[in-house]
């Protein structure tokens, strides 16, 4: 495991956890300034890799990271929504599922944090949109399917007729009827999600209050009449304000003859009702999250519009087919027919319409092509949504691993924190920078400076000792009596086999101890017995060749002046490399008589003095015998 460490940032943040090569590595916990935000989990060379980030507002991210950004699979949770899926460059993408607490859900493709490509959006009331998206909005071709009217959510915004997360509520009862003269909003005001078709002859509330000149100089739908309408109420479609209008007033702007309209007060017409089980489907083009372009909207009761759209309204050339089979076609403006009219007789209409009919036919043909394209995009969107659901499942699995990594990181941080804060007791580090367990004291078997016993063995002198300092075996090599003090080294019984331990050299060691007990360590050789010197565990010897000159102990002449006999001394011929217990191989070599040297004061050998005294006594005895 990587060694632990702690790093305090200048802004008040702090990191506690694994540390390697001067960077966060392994498990660790990092907090922001003032504990605002926290990441806990795995780190890789200074960057987050797998873990959990918790923001100051309570939102969290669990998943993969790369180069300090969210990358791979992960789950983001906020107070009102959750995203599960892929991440790219710190943003949502490429595939994932977004869900809101209200029930809204999007499954599909993402780009730069927004819905982009193909996807399926399911609304809180159960309605759906399947098709193309761009920069988080419905854009391209798609299909919007509503739920039954009594289940559809009531829209708040007067501009939104397609439900989304920011402008949706669970289905609620219809709003109270407006007061007479109350200005109606757009066609979507008070409408249900997914329902945009207007009833027969309905016109936009705002535009219907404009004065329109008619034949005979009368003002249909004047402001005065708008304020005094007795039947001022919203139509059952919920998209426009109902009014008292005659059959003729529904054909405002038509190409019919001037005398075809009544000049008296308008006759109220019963509003059309929408069944609670009615549904509505739109298939076609979308622009900036609204129905715009060519498309077809059809209600389950038979009401149908084919043609051009703009901002969720019928705008341009198109055709409306009513449930009873009758049709009206022409040019629409903000849901209001301004050129054209009802189709009563095909022959008179064909003579009057001219170019309007041609434009309507082109618009209807374009709307039908748009429906075909929208259905194809719908299938692609469904496939992308299925892939996104699989990515969401994989992201949830990664999130579980991230939570486990965060738990491990917090445990390690808790273990490291007391040790890092304790004064005077920090973890040891080896030469490579890795931490080791702190030791209260060194083990007695550990040698100083990192030397092993074989490396720390003292070397024998490379030259003979001078007369002022006679050579003697090093103390660490001399055999000691049983129970003796071995100094900084352990007993020979604990040495391993390669050092000549007791397993192989027990007999030789016993021989040394026996000689020590018998007092063999005399000051010099006696009766030609070899002198055992220090032995080295190296492969060399003190002398490799015979006949090499070597200084010996000073010799004294007898009073008669005769030269002394050659002295036989042992010379080391070879050394065993098995260890300090191994014996030395010796060979007796005859050495030439040493040259005379003046006796050094204080350097006489007691044996020599005794021999001289014995010689004097012998000479005295001989002289006494001769005299007698």
Curated annotation (Swiss-Prot):
Residue spans, topological domain Cytoplasmic: 1-606
SUPFAM superfamilies cross-referenced by the UniProt entry: Histone H3 K4-specific methyltransferase SET7/9 N-terminal domain
InterPro entries referenced in this protein's UniProt entry, alphabetically: Junctophilin, MORN
TM spans (from-to): 607-628
Effect of loss of the gene: Jph3 and Jph4 double null mutants exhibit atypical depolarizing responses, irregular cerebellar plasticity due to abolished crosstalk in Purkinje cells. There is hyperphosphorylation of PRKCG and mild impairment of synaptic maturation. Exploratory activity, hippocampal plasticity and memory are impaired and there is abnormal foot-clasping reflex.
Biased composition (Low complexity): 231-241, 453-467, 528-541
GO BP annotations listed: learning; neuromuscular process controlling balance; regulation of cytokine production; regulation of store-operated calcium entry; regulation of synaptic plasticity
GO CC annotation: dendritic shaft; endoplasmic reticulum membrane; junctional membrane complex; plasma membrane; smooth endoplasmic reticulum
Alphabetical UniProt keywords: Cell membrane, Endoplasmic reticulum, Membrane, Repeat, Transmembrane, Transmembrane helix
Region (Disordered): 158-214, 231-276, 418-603
Localisation per UniProt entry: Cell membrane; Endoplasmic reticulum membrane
Any Pfam family matching the protein: MORN
Bias-annotated ranges (Pro residues): 170-179
Function: Junctophilins contribute to the formation of junctional membrane complexes (JMCs) which link the plasma membrane with the endoplasmic or sarcoplasmic reticulum in excitable cells. Provides a structural foundation for functional cross-talk between the cell surface and intracellular calcium release channels. JPH4 is brain-specific and appears to have an active role in certain neurons involved in motor coordination and memory.
Family per similarity comment: Belongs to the junctophilin family.
Protein name as annotated: Junctophilin-4
Species of origin: Mus musculus
Gene name per UniProt: Jph4
């Amino acid at each position: 495991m990587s060694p632990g460490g702690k790093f305090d940032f200048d802004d008040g943040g702090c990191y506690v956890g694994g540390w390697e090569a001067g960077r966060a590595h392994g498990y660790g916990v990092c907090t922001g300034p003032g504990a605002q935000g926290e990441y806990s989990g795995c780190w890789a060379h200074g960057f987050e890799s797998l873990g959990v980030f918790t923001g100051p507002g309570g939102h969290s991210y669990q998943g993969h990271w790369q180069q300090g950004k969210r990358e791979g699979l992960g789950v983001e949770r906020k107070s009102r929504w959750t995203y599960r899926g892929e991440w790219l460059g710190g943003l949502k993408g490429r595939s994932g599922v977004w869900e809101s607490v209200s029930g809204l859900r999007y499954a599909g493709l993402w780009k730069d944090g927004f819905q982009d490509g193909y996807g399926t959006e399911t609304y809180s009331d159960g309605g759906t949109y399947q098709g193309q998206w761009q920069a988080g909005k419905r854009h391209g071709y798609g299909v919007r399917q509503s739920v039954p009217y009594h289940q559809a959510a009531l829209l708040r915004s007067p501009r939104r007729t397609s439900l989304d997360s920011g402008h949706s509520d669970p289905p609620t009862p219809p709003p109270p009827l407006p007061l007479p003269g109350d200005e109606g909003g757009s066609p979507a005001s008070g409408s249900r999600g997914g329902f945009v078709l207007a009833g027969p002859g309905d016109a936009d509330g705002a535009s219907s209050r404009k004065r329109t000149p008619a034949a005979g100089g009368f003002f249909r739908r004047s402001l005065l009449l708008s304020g005094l309408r007795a039947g001022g109420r919203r139509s059952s479609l919920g998209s426009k304000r109902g009014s008292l209008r005659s059959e003729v007033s529904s054909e405002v702007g038509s190409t019919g003859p001037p005398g075809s309209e009544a000049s008296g007060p308008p006759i109220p017409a019963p509003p059309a009702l929408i069944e609670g089980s009615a549904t509505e489907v739109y298939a076609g083009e979308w622009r900036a999250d609204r129905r715009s372009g060519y498309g077809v909207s059809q209600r389950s009761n038979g009401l149908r519009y084919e043609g051009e759209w703009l901002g969720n309204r019928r705008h341009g050339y198109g055709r409306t087919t009513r449930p009873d089979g009758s049709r009206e076609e022409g040019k629409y403006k903000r849901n209001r027919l301004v050129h054209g009219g009802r189709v009563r007789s095909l022959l008179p209409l064909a003579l009057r319409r001219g170019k309007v009919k041609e434009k309507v036919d082109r618009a209807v043909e374009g709307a039908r092509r748009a429906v075909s394209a929208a259905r194809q995009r719908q299938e692609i969107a469904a496939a992308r949504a299925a892939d996104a659901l699989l990515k969401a499942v994989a992201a949830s699995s990664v999130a579980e691993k991230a939570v486990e990594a965060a738990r491990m990181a917090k445990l390690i941080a808790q273990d490291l924190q007391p040790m890092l804060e304790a004064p005077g007791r920090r973890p040891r580090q080896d030469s490579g920078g890795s931490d080791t367990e702190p030791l209260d004291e060194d083990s007695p078997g550990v040698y100083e400076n990192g030397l092993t016993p074989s490396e720390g063995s003292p070397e024998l002198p490379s030259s003979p000792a001078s007369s002022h300092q006679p050579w003697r075996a090093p103390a660490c090599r001399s055999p000691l009596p049983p129970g003796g003090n071995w100094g900084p080294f352990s007993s020979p019984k604990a040495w391993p086999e390669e050092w000549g331990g007791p397993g192989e050299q027990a007999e030789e060691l016993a021989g040394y101890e026996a000689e020590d007990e018998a007092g063999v360590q005399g000051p010099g050789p006696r009766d030609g017995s070899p002198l055992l010197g220090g032995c080295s565990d190296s492969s060399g010897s003190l002398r490799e060749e015979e006949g090499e000159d070597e200084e010996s102990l000073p010799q004294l002449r007898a009073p008669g002046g005769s030269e002394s006999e050659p002295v036989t001394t042992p010379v080391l011929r070879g050394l065993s490399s098995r260890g300090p217990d191994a014996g030395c191989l010796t060979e007796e070599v005859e050495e030439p008589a040493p040259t005379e040297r003046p006796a050094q004061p204080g350097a006489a050998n007691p044996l020599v003095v005794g021999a001289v005294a014995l010689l004097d006594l012998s000479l005295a005895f001989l002289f006494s015998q001769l005299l007698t």
